């Protein structure tokens, strides 16, 4: 059986070592706090007015300012900066935190489209850093799709380990 990283690579088209090239450099030092605040603000400004109601509605119960803060604090921490996210929220546990939401392939592509557009609009991120960030985002988005799918299946009371549905007829 494929593990989640392998599935994420296959579905995203981004090899794991490319996704984690972010760990070979300190993007927080290079770009600074304000850039990540600007990126997350730009991203969520797009998400909350998305023309696609099905996507916008995934965020309907979340406060926009909180969502921005959650994301930029996570990114600052993940990109080599201070652990702002964990100090406030604890372990990121991203799969578990995304479980309430329909994190499908389609949702991942929509999320990535907004993130690509947000990156394109931030002039103080250099080309190489944008590529590195996007590889990390693509891989992580599909890691979440695979992880949420696996968690939902393993807790499905009518599905056994082989994926059969023993109580399908009830
Ligand atoms: C694949 C498509 C994705 C969907 C549909 C999705 C959806 C959501 C939603 C609805 C929230 C709740 C908003 C909030 O209150 O913070 C959330 C939170 C969050 N997402 Fe995503 N997300 C996706 C991908 C990603 C990716 C790729 C990352 C990281 C690179 C990410 C990182 C986060 C973080 C850090 C939070 C805050 C969690 C918390 O503290 O509760 N998400 N996401």
UniProtKB/Swiss-Prot annotation:
Binding site for heme b: 98
Keywords: Heme, Iron, Metal-binding, Nodulation, Oxygen transport, Transport
Keyword Iron: yes
GO molecular function: heme binding; metal ion binding; oxygen binding; oxygen carrier activity
DNA-binding found in the keyword field: no
Domain of life the protein comes from: Eukaryota
InterPro entries per UniProt: GlbO/GLB3-like, Globin-like_sf, Globin/Proto, Hemoglobin_trunc
Biological-process GO terms, alphabetical: nodulation; response to nitric oxide
Induction field: Down-regulated by nitric oxide (NO), particularly during nodulation mediated by Sinorhizobium meliloti inoculation.
Protein family membership: Belongs to the truncated hemoglobin family. Group II subfamily.
Assembly, per entry: Homodimer when ferric.
Function as written in the Swiss-Prot or TrEMBL entry: Hemoglobin-like protein that exhibits an unusual concentration-independent binding of O(2) and CO. Required for general plant development and during nodulation. May promote shoot organogenesis from root explants.
Protein name, per record: Group 2 truncated hemoglobin 3-1
Protein's organism: Medicago truncatula
Gene assigned in the entry: GLB3-1
